[in-house]
Amino acid sequence: MIKLKSILNFLYNIANKDGFKGYKECRTSAYKNVFDDSSTKSTSKFHLGISDTKNLLSLQNIIGLILIIFAGVLFYAYILQHEWRYVTLSDAQVKRYRISEKKALSLYQLMKDTHELLTKNNIKYWIESGTLLGAVRHQGIIPFDDDLDIGIMHEDEIHFQQILPQFKQLGYRIKHNKIYVICGERCLDIFIFHKEKDKFVHILYDQYPNDFFYENELYPLKKYKFGNIEVYGPFDPIGNLNRQYPEWDKYAIIYSPHSFHLLFLSNIEKKTKFILTPELLKPAQPFGPLKDKVNIVNSANIYNDMDYH
């Protein structure tokens, strides 16, 4: 469409020029204005389209879009809370959650050394929590667990404190804050139990109200297969396991506060019950070779005593 300004110029020029000549010049000028204006518009629209496309496909916009999508995924997976879901893992997927062979070996070594030191010093202990679940369900360490748990009675605590230097002789570090923690490459938690009415409970009972034993569940202690070694545990573990880990014999829950090798588990994975498969039931491996550290240290101490005398 001819702009109003062009029309007015056209009429003005006709009025101020002579006859047909003026009309012809003005008409030519008007056509020129029309085509110039139309061409300018088309070119402008064309350049505008290219400009919009370039802006849309700019590196900055692409990165921004990727970040928005990434933030959305993180919010969904790690911030939002989810309902429980049930999943069957393939054998390959199970491997993603397993602890490393090095961690497994250090845990079995730590359990062996602890068992031998406590037994040698007549301190009764029992495996507990995830370690008990591992012994019952996997006959070893749960494949995605990375610490150990045992319990001893309050009456044995002073005696236990007296043998702590023997753990240090084996190269272990000792921490104590409500519970005792024996650490090498991995750690073992020792809970001190006492009797409260008809239950045996530990100092963190308020935090873990389902972790207790009735006397007929705990005693007499019995041995459990744990990889290639044997350890002591409660006489009847089922009641304790049912209280702490409902449906433990059907499903595995990967998440635990100690799973440091799984720091980036999403909230979705934390609220997933994995259906137990033969692969998921396999304990953490390898079982060995394990060193005979306690006997070696004992032999060295005896030799030093003889040499001293």
Swiss-Prot record:
Annotated TM spans: 62-82
GO process terms (BP): glycoprotein metabolic process
A single cellular component GO annotation: membrane
Location in or out of the cell: Membrane
Molecular-function GO terms, alphabetical: transferase activity
Domain RPE1 insert: 9-55
Membrane topology annotation: Single-pass membrane protein
Top-level taxon of origin: Bacteria
Record keywords, A-Z: Membrane, Transferase, Transmembrane, Transmembrane helix
One of the Pfam families matching this protein, by short name: LicD
InterPro entries in the record: LicD/FKTN/FKRP_NTP_transf, LPS_cholinephosphotransferase, RPE1
NCBIfam families in the cross-refs: RPE1
Family, as annotated: Belongs to the LicD transferase family.
Name of the protein in question: Uncharacterized protein RT0683
Source species: Rickettsia typhi (strain ATCC VR-144 / Wilmington)
